């Protein structure tokens, strides 16, 4: 393994209940096995003091209705704070960043679930992020019904998790469309056993790291 390899940005994506926490552990174990141990973990929305405040507004605001576009703009405000103040500096230091969600979430949830115009989303993405994107994305795919059942088992649902099943069906459909067109993304069947999901993730990460370190 080339220990002088630059920092990389790996993102975990998926619906509620997809198992991103378990997936992160699998990614860490595989990276460590390959000698990559200088890791940083992020989540979206969140990850900086301002971004965490926006996260609370996005997920738990109850004083007034949050419009779809206000939600979208708060997500991008939180995202750019995290990218500029945390992720880019970490990558410059050679750290490998493992993110719980990134821009693909907005493309899927707001573009698919909320049905916001895709051209608006693309324009906003380019304006805010420029050409910044993950080096590798693992999309944990499962049916919304299974995911929501898992999420309910964790306790009270937040504002996003309370959306109806049709919302999550649209979100999943958009996720799959986006991932299939993305050569830097891999689909993981998250309906399998934890052992099988873990094995698939480790294989995907190992294959990707080997491909970029040749």
Curated annotation (Swiss-Prot):
Matches recorded under Gene3D superfamilies: P-loop containing nucleotide triphosphate hydrolases
CDD domains in the record: TMPK (cd01672)
Gene Ontology CC: one annotated term: cytosol
Keywords recorded for this protein, A-Z: ATP-binding, Kinase, Nucleotide biosynthesis, Nucleotide-binding, Transferase
Reactions listed under catalytic activity: dTMP + ATP = dTDP + ADP
UniProt cross-references to InterPro entries, sorted A to Z: P-loop_NTPase (IPR027417), Thymidylate_kin-like_dom (IPR039430), Thymidylate_kin_CS (IPR018095), Thymidylate_kinase (IPR018094)
EC number: 2.7.4.9
GO biological process: dTDP biosynthetic process; dTTP biosynthetic process; dUDP biosynthetic process
SUPFAM superfamilies hit by this protein: P-loop containing nucleoside triphosphate hydrolases
GO MF annotation, one: ATP binding
Binding site for ATP: 14-21
Signal peptide: none
Keyword Transmembrane helix set for record: no
Keyword flag Kinase: yes
Family listed: Belongs to the thymidylate kinase family.
Biological role: Phosphorylation of dTMP to form dTDP in both de novo and salvage pathways of dTTP synthesis.
Protein name per Swiss-Prot or TrEMBL: Thymidylate kinase
Species this chain originates from: Mannheimia succiniciproducens (strain KCTC 0769BP / MBEL55E)
């Amino acid at each position: 393994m080339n220990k002088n390899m630059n920092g990389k940005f790996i993102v975990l994506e998926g619906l509620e209940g997809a198992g991103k926490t378990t997936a992160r552990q699998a990614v860490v174990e595989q990276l460590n096995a390959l000698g990559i141990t200088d890791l940083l973990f992020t989540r979206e929305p969140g990850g900086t003091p301002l971004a965490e405040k926006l996260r609370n507004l996005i997920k738990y605001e109850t004083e007034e209705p949050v419009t779809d576009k206000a939600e979208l703009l708060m997500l991008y405000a939180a995202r750019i704070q995290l990218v500029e103040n945390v992720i880019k500096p970490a990558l410059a230091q050679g750290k490998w960043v493992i993110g719980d969600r990134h821009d693909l979430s907005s493309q899927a949830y707001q573009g698919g679930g909320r049905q916001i115009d895709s051209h608006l989303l693309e324009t906003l993405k380019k304006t805010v992020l420029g050409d910044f994107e993950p080096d590798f994305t693992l999309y944990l795919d499962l049916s919304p019904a299974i995911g929501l059942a898992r999420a309910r088992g964790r306790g009270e649902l937040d504002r996003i998790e309370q959306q109806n099943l049709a919302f999550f069906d649209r979100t999943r459909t958009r996720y799959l469309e986006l991932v299939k067109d993305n050569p830097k993304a891999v689909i993981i069947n998250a309906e399998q056993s934890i052992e099988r999901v873990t094995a698939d993730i480790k294989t995907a990460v190992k294959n990707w790291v080997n491909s970029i370190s040749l």
